[in-house]
Amino acid sequence: MVNRRRKKMKKKVCTFCADKSSKIDYKEVHKLKKYVTERGKILPRRISGNCAIHQRDITQAIKRSRHIALLPYTID
């Protein structure tokens, strides 16, 4: 068996906590697209690097913008 060492993942800093003036808004589609995969799924917190509070806000904003057709549910 090969002995593999795991690299320690560096914890990402939440972009919204670092920049206090930045707000999460469902109408700002260009910001929300960073947190959606190419298949249309919402990125998990461990990949996006957001804190729990802001991840919930991003998820809610993405769902709102999908509902009013600013963001697509799926991407072909």
From Swiss-Prot:
A single GO molecular function term of this UniProt record: small ribosomal subunit rRNA binding
InterPro entries named in the record: Ribosomal_bS18, Ribosomal_bS18_CS, Ribosomal_bS18_sf
Transmembrane segments: none
GO BP annotations, alphabetical order: translation
A GO CC term assigned to this protein in UniProt: cytosolic small ribosomal subunit
Pfam families linked: Ribosomal_S18
Keywords of this entry: Ribonucleoprotein, Ribosomal protein, RNA-binding, rRNA-binding
Subunit-level organization: Part of the 30S ribosomal subunit. Forms a tight heterodimer with protein bS6.
Family: Belongs to the bacterial ribosomal protein bS18 family.
Record function comment: Binds as a heterodimer with protein bS6 to the central domain of the 16S rRNA, where it helps stabilize the platform of the 30S subunit.
Name the record gives this protein: Small ribosomal subunit protein bS18
Lineage of the organism: Bacteria, Bacillati, Bacillota, Clostridia, Peptostreptococcales
Name of the coding gene: rpsR
